[in-house]
Amino acid sequence: MKRIVILMLAVVSLSILANAKKPKVVKPSPFVQMKSGHFERAGKPYYYVGTNFWYGAILGSEGQGGDRQRLLRELDNLKAMGIDNLRILVGSDGEQGVTTKVEPTLQKAPGVYNDTILAGLDYLLMEMGKRQMVAVLYLNNSWEWSGGYGFYLEHAGEGKAPRPNEAGYTAFMNFVSKYASCEKAHQLFYQYVKDIISRTNRYTGLKYTDDPAIMSWQIGNEPRAFSQEAKQPFAKWLAEASALIRSLDKNHLISIGSEGSWGCENDMALYEQICSDVNIDYMNIHLWPYNWGWAHERTLRKDFEQSCRNTKQYIDEHLQLASRLSKPVVMEEFGFPRDGFSFSQESTTTVRDAYYRFVFGLVADNALSGGNFAGCNFWGWGGEANPTHQQWQVGDPYTGDPAQEAQGLNSVFSTDTTTIQVIREQVERIGSAGK
C-alpha cells in the first residue's frame, strides 16, 4: 500500500512538473501593430501594396451614390491583385451642391450625421473583414474636396471658406491657415472624432475599437499649417488630436496623413517634430510630380527623369528620419498623369507605368534590405468606373479622382492592364520582404 501511495505521488509530481514546463501560448494580436520600426499582423511581418479608395463608404451605402454590388466587385478585384490595404475617407462635411466637393456628405453640420453614409462605412468594414483586408481611415482634410478645415472654420464663426475654383488656391489657403489656431474649430472636430471612433458596427456588432479590419486612424488627408506663423499651433493641434484618439482606442495604430516635408511648409524640422510624437506610430509621405511642378502637362515624358531624381531625393531624406525615429514609413499617395495628359481610359499609360515601377522599386529595395519602408498606396483606384464627364457631376460613377479633379487624371481603371501588371509584380516583390 505504501509503495502504491509513493508511486501515485510521483505520478502527480511529474504531471505538475510537465505542465509547469509547458510554455504559455500567446495568441497573436489580430490588429496591425508597430514593433521595432516595422509592422506586424497576426504575429507576422506585414509589408503591403495598397491603394486609395476614398469613396468606399459612399459606395457601401444604400442611398445616393451607393452601389454595394460594385463595391463587392471592386473589393474582390483588388484582393485578387494582392491588394489588402485601402486608404479611405470616413466622410465629407458640409453643404451639398458644391461643384468641387464630393457628395453625399456625412456630416451636414457639426454633430449632424447622414446615417446612410455611416451604414455604408459599417458595410464596407464588414466586407473588408471578410476578405482579410484592412482600412486606413482618415478623419479630416485640409483640402476643399471633402469639407474638412473649411467646414470647421465656417462653423467656428470664421466666415465662408473661399472656393478654390472661384477665388483661387491662394485665397483658400490663406483662409484655412486659420485652422491651426482656431480652438473652436478643433473642438468641433474632436467631437466628430469621438462620435466616429466610439461607433459600433450595425452589421457585425463589433465596436470600431475592436475591429481588426481597421489598421489605422489617420488625423487627416494631407494636413498642413498653410503658413509659417501657423506651424507651431499646427504641431500642437496634431499632438492633441493624436492623444485624443489614443485615449479612445488602444488597439489601432495612429498616423498623421502628412505629405512629408512638403506638407510642413518644406520644413523638415517641423515634420520631424510631428512624427516624433509618442502617439504617432508610423510616418506617411506623398509624391506628386505633376502637382509639385516636377513634371508639366506638355512635357510629361521629357520630365520623367527629373521627376525620378526628385522622387529619390525626397524619399531618401524621409527614410533617414524614419531610421532615427525607428518608425515604419508608408508611401501612401503617389500618382502620375496618363500619357499626353489625357483623361480618357483609351489613352496609354507608358510614363505612368514607368513612374509606378520606379517608386515601387524604391519601396521594395528598402524593405527587402531591412529598411523602414513598410508599404505603399498608389492613388487611386478607379476600378470599373467609366467617367461620363470631365468634371464630376451628381450621378456619375466615383473614380480615384475626387470632385475637384478631372475624372481620369490619376485613376487606375480595371482596363489599365499594363499598370495593373506593374502593380501585380510589385505586390509579390514587396510582400516577400517579411518572408
Where do the protein language model's features map onto the residues?
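Bacterial Sec-dependent N-terminal signal peptides
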Residues: 1-24
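Active-site mouth of glycoside hydrolases
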Residues: 25-295, 301-328, 334-434
